[in-house]
Amino acid sequence: MTKSELVAQLASRFPQLVLKDADFAVKTMLDAMSDALSKGHRIEIRGFGSFGLNRRPARVGRNPKSGEKVQVPEKHVPHFKPGKELRERVDGRAGEPLKNDEPEDAQ
């Protein structure tokens, strides 16, 4: 799913939300998540998963063209860890709704 598909699905799921507002909501959410990660914070969305940073230590690499050794500096990379509900849903239970998707009278 692309960002534009997510915006379209959000707008179709909530008829009172016009496409422009859905796009703004998605962009705002992604910007907030990017800002939090860039500041070193962890993001946890219950039932979905968590985003964090993993540290990649400095290492010696090789230039593929010349074969010479190159020092690759340490860096931090974004990492996603899926939550239990998402893992279960993806693992063969793709047709089952998440707990929050069920109608209240069905419980």
Swiss-Prot record:
UniProt keyword annotation of Membrane present: no
Biased composition (Basic and acidic residues): 65-101
GO terms for cellular component: chromosome; cytosol
Region (Disordered) location: 55-107
GO molecular function: DNA binding; structural constituent of chromatin
Subunit structure: Heterodimer of an alpha and a beta chain.
Protein name, per record: Integration host factor subunit beta
Phylogenetic placement of the source organism: Bacteria, Pseudomonadati, Pseudomonadota, Betaproteobacteria, Burkholderiales
